[in-house]
């Protein structure tokens, strides 16, 4: 049976240096990192956030835009990013499908789990867009939900750091990397892995969460294909020494 993974990228990772828009070089880099996975037989699902375009929380903080409307705007932003990512993957000769939780048939397919799984079985990449289709849920939760639905072996949160730390390593030089932790430990307030809903969903379904640095070339291949887990953090139901 082929290994099936769900990889979550933040929208900010796609942004230009000013934090906005879509950086074509980053798109190209991500696609170049995904291609070896597909070529080796890994079935790949992707979720990308929309923070480089708009965040629902930020859009609604002045009180003019309702939070629910802000979240829908954020969902539309993820569709924009998903289509951009689809183009980059196809540039590398890969076959990719965008499935949206909100129907927009002229742009992408609606999310249908059986169709998504069939695409994966045929070696196509599926990019899941528009979150869960509901406001008040993050793209981390959407990614975890899709990972569970498609029967992924793991969910990988590809970030700008090489794992989970006890505090922000960009602010605190003495931050300690946590190589292995349980779901309950990941739910602690000072440990930022994903939001609580996403972690609880992963826990209920025994879905391993892997946090790694997306900007280290070959890292995804090393983790997924070579099973090299030294350069990441893993969240599971128990620690390695238990």
From Swiss-Prot:
SUPFAM superfamilies: Carbamate kinase-like (SSF53633). GO terms for cellular component: cytosol. Inhibited by UTP. ATP binds at residues 8-11, 51, 55, 159, 165, 168. One of its GO terms (molecular function) is ATP binding. It is found in: Cytoplasm. Keywords: ATP-binding, Cytoplasm, Kinase, Nucleotide-binding, Pyrimidine biosynthesis, Transferase. Pathway: Pyrimidine metabolism; CTP biosynthesis via de novo pathway; UDP from UMP (UMPK route): step 1/1. Its main location: cytoplasm. Transmembrane segments: none annotated. It is an enzyme of class 2 (transferase). PANTHER family: URIDYLATE KINASE, URIDYLATE KINASE PUMPKIN, CHLOROPLASTIC. Homohexamer. This is Uridylate kinase. It comes from Nitratiruptor sp. (strain SB155-2).
């Amino acid at each position: 049976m082929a290994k099936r993974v769900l990889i979550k990228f933040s929208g900010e990772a796609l942004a230009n240096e000013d934090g906005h828009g879509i950086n074509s070089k980053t798109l190209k880099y991500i696609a170049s990192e995904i291609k070896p996975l597909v070529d080796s037989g890994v079935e790949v699902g992707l979720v990308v956030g929309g923070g480089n375009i708009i965040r629902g929380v930020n859009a609604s903080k002045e009180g003019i835009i309702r939070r629910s409307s802000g979240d829908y705007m954020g969902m539309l932003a993820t569709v924009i990013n998903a289509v951009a990512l689809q183009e980059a993957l196809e540039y590398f000769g890969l076959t990719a499908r965008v499935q949206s939780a909100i129907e927009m048939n002229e742009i992408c397919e609606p999310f249908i789990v059986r169709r998504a799984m069939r695409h994966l079985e045929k070696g196509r990449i599926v990019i899941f867009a528009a979150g869960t289709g509901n406001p008040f849920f993050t793209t981390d939760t959407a990614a975890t939900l899709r990972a569970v639905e498609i029967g992924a072996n793991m969910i990988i949160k590809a970030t700008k750091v090489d794992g989970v730390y006890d505090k922000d390593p960009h602010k605190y030089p003495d931050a300690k990397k946590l190589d292995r932790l349980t779901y309950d430990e990941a739910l602690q307030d000072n440990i930022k892995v994903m939001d609580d809903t996403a972690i609880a969903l992963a826990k209920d379904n025994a879905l391993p969460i892997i946090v790694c640095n997306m900007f280290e070339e070959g890292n995804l291949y090393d983790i997924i294909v070579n099973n090299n887990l030294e350069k990441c953090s893993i969240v599971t139901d128990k620690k390695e020494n238990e």
